[in-house]
Every structure is written in structure tokens, then in C-alpha cells.
Curated annotation (Swiss-Prot):
One of its GO terms (molecular function) is methionyl-tRNA formyltransferase activity. GO terms for cellular component: cytosol. It catalyses: L-methionyl-tRNA(fMet) + (6R)-10-formyltetrahydrofolate = N-formyl-L-methionyl-tRNA(fMet) + (6S)-5,6,7,8-tetrahydrofolate + H(+). PANTHER family: METHIONYL-TRNA FORMYLTRANSFERASE, METHIONYL-TRNA FORMYLTRANSFERASE, MITOCHONDRIAL. Its EC number is 2.1.2.9. (6S)-5,6,7,8-tetrahydrofolate binds at S107, L108, L109, P110. Attaches a formyl group to the free amino group of methionyl-tRNA(fMet). The formyl group appears to play a dual role in the initiator identity of N-formylmethionyl-tRNA by promoting its recognition by IF2 and preventing the misappropriation of this tRNA by the elongation apparatus. It comes from Borreliella afzelii (strain PKo) (Borrelia afzelii). InterPro entries: Fmt, Formyl_trans_C, Formyl_trans_C_sf, Formyl_transf_N, Formyl_transf_N_sf, Formyl_transferase-like_C_sf, Met-tRNA-FMT_C, Met-tRNA-FMT_N. This is Methionyl-tRNA formyltransferase.
Length: 315
């Protein structure tokens, strides 16, 4: 089976490496190079670099015009495999592939159709999520399910953590799906009545409101790592939050919302909220390295009693 691989994200790298071992990958579609770093030099993503290293034809157009479509047709691909590309395809493009098109989606479809399934699962405090290998349909994330696998989300897991987990679990699931396709399996239709949807995170998604419950705040902090990163303000500047947990206790009701009320070397830095205690576990001052809560506290012993304020904006 000749496979045409489509991705622009490192989350798909392990799948790409595994597929190349078992199938003929005739081409790769990815996004154009992007400026990166202080010098804003154009940088190739890891999928493109890996494809070049394996001498696989790479397409990185701004738009899929007729010329690009014809070049892809000339490769005579049987099937397209898509994992985190970031654009929606027209029927004309999908019709190029006689054995169809499949997609790796990091949620238990039909839950969390859309662009931010990992972040949304964490933001909503889900304890379980998963991976779906689906046939692609014109309607976003609505195709028949070929393979699904669930996994647990721990309370302090971040989107970065879950992305790494998805990256490691996906290769075997894709191989299983391709084997099923080879045997004529058409997949199981989704229950559209159970579909939920998720949208893009914005920079403002990382603004923390300490009037919310500790549970809601820790979910937002963990969901926003690695982007846009949650943050709030102390007297001397912004503090970026990379990881958090929470306690269902209300021992500090007399304290201000957002006030740093305690430090526990085994649990974290305690912050009072609208309900419960937020445990800050990993934090950062802008331009400096990320610190665990112990190092942050040891470097700022006057933290207790200081009060975080929200930066503003809307979620």
C-alpha cells in the first residue's frame, strides 16, 4: 500500500517513523517553513526534516492548487494518513486516494471534534480521554471509527504530557487501523447525537481568574502548557504557571482570593481561590528558566502573603 503522509507537528513524528518501516510512503504534505527565534530565520518542522532525511518527496505549499494536486496524483498513492496538519481538505483532494483517507485524532470521538481535543479534555477536568483512528469525512471529525484506545489523565498532567503520551501510543494504533483497512473493514459510524466540539485556544485563554475554584484554575493552567501558558501578576511582574494541582479544602477563607497563603515542601505553593486551594508546582518568571515550587519558594522567601492579580482579558 502506497501512503501519502500529512502532518506539520512533532506529535506525529513517531507515527511517521513507524509507517515508513512497514509501508511505502510516496510523499509528505506539510506546512511551509516558519520564522523562528530571535533572528526569525525560516525553520523546517520535524516532519519535513525527517522526510528529507529519508529521501521522501515533500510538498509544503501555502494552498493546494491544481498544480500541487496533479503532482500528488502522479505519485499514485493508495491512502492518505493525516495527523495534526491544521487545514481542512476539499472533496477533490480526498478523492485522489482510492483506499481512502484516515486521521489520527487525540480524543474519544465523537467527543471533542475540532482543533484542541487534548487541551479541552484537561480544561474540562476529564479523567479519561483517548485516541481515535477514523476515516476522514467532509464534515470535520465525523468519519467512521477504525480504532480507539483510552488512557487516564492525572490531575496534574499538562497538554504537553498528554501530547507525548498520544505520540507514543499512536503508531501501533495506526498500524492496527491499516491492517483492518487491508481486510476490508469500513469502520463503525459515530453517534453524531453525542458529538461535542472544541475550538482554538487564544492567548487570553491563559489569563487566570482566582475567583474561580482551584479545580477550574489548575485545569486551565495544565491545559495551557505548552501554549499559551497561563499567567498572573505579582507586585514585581508577571508569573507564568506551567503545572498545578489543587486541594479541596477551605482553611483560608479569611485570606484574599489570589493570596499565597502557605508552602508545603511535599505538596506545593498554596494559593487561595474562590473555592479550595491551588497548588502551584512549576512556575517561571518571563525570560528565566522554569522552576519547581521548592526552588521558586527558596529564591523568594517573602512570597507568603503576596497576592496574585488577574492580567485581564476573556477566556
Amino acid at each position: 500500500m502506497k501512503i501519502f503522509f500529512v502532518s506539520s507537528s512533532s506529535i506525529a513524528l513517531e507515527v511517521f517513523k513507524e509507517i515508513v518501516k512497514h509501508y511505502e510512503v510516496v510523499g509528505v504534505l506539510t506546512l511551509p517553513d516558519k520564522p523562528k527565534g530571535r533572528g526569525q530565520k525560516l525553520s523546517q518542522n520535524v516532519i519535513k526534516l525527517e522526510a528529507i532525511a529519508k529521501n521522501i518527496k515533500v510538498f509544503d505549499p501555502l494552498i493546494l492548487d491544481d498544480n500541487i494536486l496533479n503532482l500528488i496524483r502522479d505519485l499514485n498513492p493508495d491512502l492518505m494518513l493525516v495527523f495534526s496538519y491544521g487545514k481542512i481538505f476539499k472533496k477533490e483532494f480526498l478523492d485522489i486516494f482510492p483506499k481512502g483517507c484516515i486521521n489520527v485524532h487525540p480524543s474519544l470521538l465523537p467527543k471533542y471534534r475540532g482543533v484542541s481535543p487534548i487541551q479541552s479534555a484537561i480544561l474540562n477536568g476529564d479523567c479519561v480521554s483517548g485516541i481515535t483512528i477514523q476515516n476522514m469525512a467532509l464534515k470535520m471529525d465525523s468519519g467512521n471509527i477504525l480504532v480507539q484506545k483510552n488512557f487516564k489523565i492525572k490531575s496534574c498532567d499538562t497538554s504537553y504530557d498528554i501530547s507525548k503520551l498520544v505520540s507514543s501510543l499512536s503508531p501501533n494504533l495506526v498500524l492496527e487501523a491499516l491492517e483492518k483497512i487491508g481486510k476490508g473493514f469500513l469502520g463503525i459510524p459515530q453517534k453524531s447525537s453525542e458529538a461535542t466540539f472544541c475550538s482554538f485556544f487564544k492567548k487570553e485563554s491563559g489569563f487566570v481568574d482566582f475567583n474561580l475554584s482551584a479545580f477550574e484554575i489548575k485545569n486551565r493552567i495544565n491545559a495551557c502548557n505548552p501554549w499559551p501558558l497561563a499567567r498572573a501578576r505579582l507586585d514585581y511582574g508577571d508569573i507564568i504557571f506551567h503545572r498545578a494541582d489543587f486541594l479541596k479544602i477551605d482553611l483560608y477563607k479569611e485570606k484574599k482570593v489570589g493570596e499565597i497563603v502557605d508552602f508545603d515542601s511535599e505538596k506545593g505553593l498554596f494559593v487561595n481561590t474562590g473555592e479550595g486551594i491551588l497548588l502551584l508546582l512549576e512556575v517561571q518568571r518571563p525570560g528565566r528558566r522554569v522552576l519547581d515550587y521548592k526552588s521558586f519558594y527558596n529564591g523568594s522567601r517573602q512570597l507568603i502573603g503576596q497576592v496574585f492579580s488577574s492580567i485581564g482579558g476573556v477566556y
